[in-house]
Design a protein with these regions (language model features):
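S-adenosyl-L-methionine
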Residues: 1-26
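A conserved structural/catalytic subdomain of Rossmann-like adenosyl-cofactor enzymes
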Residues: 18-20, 24-206
């Protein structure tokens, strides 16, 4: 699978959020890549508040939207020197309540490294716009890079496609971590705080 030999794969069938990864196997990883079901309902039972994946945030994501539950699950299993990328709907960037509290905590810790807006209609399962949230545990500052790649794609009938040149532009902006007019902006923590920890991309890239 994706050039990873079968001997290096460990697959389990179960409810990721209800039953965490077994402790008799490696539980922290250099890279975590996730594309979970968007805004799926889950069992937000009170006992999860003592689960180490969620305990430090003191609030559970709402039962009607498991987006941040998946994010925190993956983030917990990330090594301190690792990088995580998760594809999520844009609502995670600005919704309030418990999600807003979790987002604010992550930002204050410097854990959110970048937000990349993707074109709508690039996944076969949904036509809604999505974004990639990149997280790190060892980030030395609290700046966040915003990339708006939502307008650059090839359209083919009912689907949109990212071509190599589109991916390369995203990669270069991510690597350089600098402003690109109408495409990328490196926002300071003060700027984000003044926006009440709202990460909606048009607030930073217009």
């Amino acid at each position: 699978l994706h050039r990873v030999p079968g001997t290096h794969q460990h697959l389990r069938n179960g409810d990721t959020l209800d039953a965490d990864w077994p402790t008799d196997e490696p539980t922290n990883f250099d890279a975590v890549v996730m594309n979970p079901p968007y805004s799926q309902k889950y069992d937000a039972k009170e006992s999860l508040l003592s689960d180490p994946r969620f305990a430090q945030f003191r609030k559970l994501p709402p039962a009607s939207k498991a987006d941040y539950a998946f994010l925190l699950h993956g983030f917990y299993h990330l090594k301190n020197t690792g990088t995580m990328g998760i594809v999520l709907p844009h609502g995670v960037l600005f919704r309030g309540g418990a999600e807003g509290t979790i987002r604010e905590t992550l930002l204050k810790k410097g854990s959110i490294y970048a937000v990349i807006g993707l074109p709508a209609g690039i996944f076969f399962s949904t036509g809604i716009p999505t974004c990639i949230v990149v997280l790190k545990k060892d980030n030395t500052n609290r700046d966040v890079l915003f990339i708006d790649a939502s307008k650059e794609f090839r359209k083919d009938r009912a689907k949109n496609f990212l071509e190599p040149e589109h991916i390369e532009k995203i990669f270069n902006a991510y690597k350089n971590r600098a402003d690109v007019e109408k495409y990328a902006h490196l926002a300071t923590f003060d700027e984000i705080e003044k926006n009440d920890f709202n990460l909606n991309i048009p607030r930073y890239v217009d």
